[in-house]
Curated annotation (Swiss-Prot):
Induction: Specifically expressed during the first hours of infection of the host plant. Expression is induced during the appressorium-mediated penetration of host roots and peaks during the penetration process. Expression then declines during early biotrophy, and becomes barely detectable during the invasive growth of the oomycete along the stele, and later during the necrotrophic phase of the infection. The lineage of its organism: Eukaryota, Sar, Stramenopiles, Oomycota, Peronosporales. Residues 1-21 form the signal peptide. It is found in: Secreted; Host cell. Keywords: Secreted, Signal, Virulence. GO terms for cellular component: extracellular region; host cell. The gene is PSE1. It comes from the Eukaryota. It comes from Phytophthora nicotianae (Potato buckeye rot agent). The RxLR-dEER motif acts to carry the protein into the host cell cytoplasm through binding to cell surface phosphatidylinositol-3-phosphate. This is Secreted RxLR effector protein PSE1. InterPro entries: RXLR. The keyword Repeat does not apply. The keyword GTP-binding does not apply. Belongs to the RxLR effector family.
Length: 145
């Protein structure tokens, strides 16, 4: 075959490919196919997994986690927190007032620690000293007692 024939055939192929009519007709768009193929699968999977999860949460009414446990025990009473914050300003972590020690022990029983304390009502700026004292006590003195 001559060089001119290769050029003509190549130009025709390039023209067909760039126009897109042959490509679109021959191959459907990949995104349409994958979206149609995956969507029903995701719905079925979500319905079965989500359904079990919803049933489990509805059966024990425990969606909120640590804050709900702490609130059920009455740990976050406003007047009590205000008094404890004032005590936190006056106490050191190595020599706690018994009320602060009891409060910190109640926080631990409610599965509150320095890394998840921001999920409780103690995340407000008013309780900064109380959070800092709890963090120091938890880090250095909790395990010793």
């Amino acid at each position: 075959m001559r060089l001119s024939s290769f050029i003509v055939v190549g130009a025709a192929v390039v023209n067909l490919l760039t126009s897109g009519s042959v490509v679109v007709a021959a191959f459907p768009r990949v995104s349409d196919v994958s979206a149609m193929a995956i969507a029903p699968h995701r719905m079925d999977q979500g319905a079965t997994n989500g359904g079990k999860r919803l049933l489990r949460y509805h059966s024990n009414n425990n969606r909120g986690g640590d804050e709900d446990i702490a609130e059920e025990r009455g740990i976050f009473d406003f007047k009590n927190l205000e008094m404890l914050t004032n005590l936190a300003r006056l106490n050191k972590a190595n020599n706690l007032d018994s009320r602060l020690d009891d409060f910190f022990q109640a926080l631990i029983k409610a599965k509150v620690n320095p890394t998840n304390i921001h999920h409780t009502r103690l995340d407000q700026d008013d309780y900064l000293e109380l959070r800092q004292l709890f963090r120091t006590w938890y880090t250095f003195y909790h395990r010793a007692s």
